[in-house]
Amino acid sequence: MDKKSARIRRATRARRKIKELGATRLVVHRTPRHIYAQVIAPNGSEVLVAASTLEKAVTEQLKYSGNKDAAAAVGKALAERALEKGISKVSFDRSGFQYHGRVQALADAAREAGLQF
C-alpha cells in the first residue's frame, strides 16, 4: 500500500463515521502549494462554505500560500463565513492527513475564530 492509498483509506473511515453521526463537516485538503477547506452539509451533497489559498481575499496579506500562516488565514476566513451563515458546530475531517503542521494551524485558527469541533 502506497502513501496516497493509505491516506485515502484513513479518510474513508473518518468520513463514514461522520456520516453516521449526521454532522456538518469541515473538510481539509492540502497540496504542497495550497490548502483548501470546505464546510459540507450533513447529507454530503452541498458545500455550504469554502475558503482556500487560491482566493485573493485570503492571499493578499500572505507572502507564500503553502505554509502555516496561509493555513491559519484560510481557517480564520472559513470560520468567519460559516458563522455568518449560522454554522457554529462542525466535525473536523482531515482527509487522512496527519493532524500536524498546516492542518493543525487551520484547525486552531478556525477554533479561535469561533467554530466548535
UniProtKB/Swiss-Prot annotation:
Pfam families: Ribosomal_L18p
Ribosomal protein as UniProt keyword: yes
Keywords from the UniProt entry: Ribonucleoprotein, Ribosomal protein, RNA-binding, rRNA-binding
UniProt xrefs under HAMAP family: Ribosomal_uL18_B
Family: Belongs to the universal ribosomal protein uL18 family.
Subunit field text: Part of the 50S ribosomal subunit; part of the 5S rRNA/L5/L18/L25 subcomplex. Contacts the 5S and 23S rRNAs.
Protein name: Large ribosomal subunit protein uL18
Species: Serratia proteamaculans (strain 568)
Gene that this polypeptide is encoded by: rplR
